[in-house]
Every structure is written in C-alpha cells, then in structure tokens.
UniProtKB/Swiss-Prot annotation:
It comes from the Bacteria. It is an enzyme of class 2 (transferase). Its EC number is 2.7.4.9. ATP binds at residues 20-27. Gene3D superfamilies: P-loop containing nucleotide triphosphate hydrolases. This is Thymidylate kinase.
Length: 228
C-alpha cells in the first residue's frame, strides 16, 4: 500500500506503543514513523512514559533518579501508575478522540515487564492499577523492539556519553536479560496486538519493518487500492 492510502483513515485516532529494553532504538523508530505519518498528512502526536504530561514528568524525575526505588517495588509501581493516570486522561485520550494518531514510547507493557516480571510486584496489584489508570484503553498496535542485551547497553552508553546511568540502565546484566525475555513473552502471549521486531539492523531497515507491521495490522489494503 502506498503512503497515500493512509489518508483514508478517519474517525478515532490510532494508539501505537513502542516497547523494548534499554538501547533498542524506540525513540529513533518513533520519530521515523511519525515523520512518515505526517508526510501522509496524518495528525500525529509523539509522547512518552513515564512522562508525557506536566504531572507525569514530575513522577518521571522521581523514578529515573532512583528515588522511587528507595520506597520499594510496590511504591515505585504506584508512582508509575500515578504518572500514567495523568498522561492518559490529559494527553492520550483527548488526542485519540480528536482523530490524532498517538505514538507512545513505553506504556503499560513496561510496567508488566519491569515491575511485574523483574520487580516482584504481583500481577494482581498491577492489573488493579491498570483498571484504574487506563480502564478499557488498549494500544491498537504494540511494536516490541528486540535486540541482544549487550548491544542495547552499548547503544545506551554511547547515547548517554559521560552522563550517569538512569535507574534502569544501571541494573545488572541479568536484569536486562530477564527484561528481554519478559518482552518476548508478552509478544508471544498477545500476537494480535504485539509485533516483535528485530532491531539489530540499521535504523532505516528497522523502520521498514515497523512500517510493514503498521500497514499490515492497521491499514488493510482495500480491494480498490493497488499495492506498491
């Protein structure tokens, strides 16, 4: 399908989330996809978690600085939930109702992977918080970028330069290996929503894979449109 076919989409916006471990290239791929959608004259909003709204950005600082970790895994998860609640109700939902396509760097799957699988927070608590913070909101498509842990951490270090690793970049190698497996399990458990994409290639090649996933899942080719 050509990019012009994207313009036929109307009504409520689409919600696309990007997930993956550290250094997998989420921000790069979100920008490339946003540029392509905007070139097709689609209204597009790029946002992130934790953060994305003034209130949520305060929580982002608390979490990534490591202050949340001092409170214990459950309390840290509550900080993420508070940030998500503000983000969903002040940014994401209003944009979707206006027909805007929302591209989000991390969402609820990050809580399942980081705090659920690796942070010893019970699935029951996570599910309860999700019912309160996001209700019935669910991504139309989740792109999970997959990359060998060592390569991802090297990329993250190069991006950071001389800066201090954040709360999660500074975790042990075993943490990041477990994180990769947690994301792979999410992709395997929810194939209708999630697409696992090999991110161990140059950015343009990965961007092509992301576009193919979006086109196939959200932009089915009408009989009257000739694929190119």
């Amino acid at each position: 399908m050509s990019d012009s076919a994207v313009q036929r989409s109307s009504g409520r916006g689409r919600f696309i989330t990007f997930e993956g471990g550290e250094g997998t290239g989420k921000s790069t791929q979100i920008k490339k996809l946003a540029d392509r959608l905007k070139a097709a004259r689609m209204r597009t909003l790029v946002t992130r978690e934790p953060g994305g709204s003034p209130g949520a950005e305060i929580m982002r600082h608390l979490v990534l600085s490591g202050m949340g970790k001092l409170l214990g895994p459950e309390a840290e998860t509550l900080l993420f939930a508070a940030a998500r609640d503000d983000h969903v109700h002040t940014v994401i939902e209003p944009a979707l109702k206006q027909g805007i396509w929302v591209l989000c760097d991390r969402f609820a799957d990050s809580t399942r992977a980081y705090q659920g699988s690796l942070g010893s927070v019970s699935p029951g608590l996570i599910n309860a918080m999700q019912r309160v913070t996001i209700g019935d909101l669910k991504p139309d498509l989740t792109i999970i970028l997959d990359l060998p842990v060592e390569i991802g951490l090297q990329r993250a270090a190069a991006r950071r330069g001389s800066g201090t690793p954040d709360r999660f970049e500074g975790e042990q190698l075993s943490f990041h290996q477990g994180l990769r497996e947690a994301y792979r399990k999410i992709a395997a458990d929810e194939p209708a929503r999630c697409v696992l994409i090999d991110a161990n290639s140059d950015p343009d090649t990965v961007a092509g894979r992301v576009w193919s996933a979006l086109r196939d899942r959200l932009l089915p080719t009408p009989a009257s449109v000739v694929s190119v």
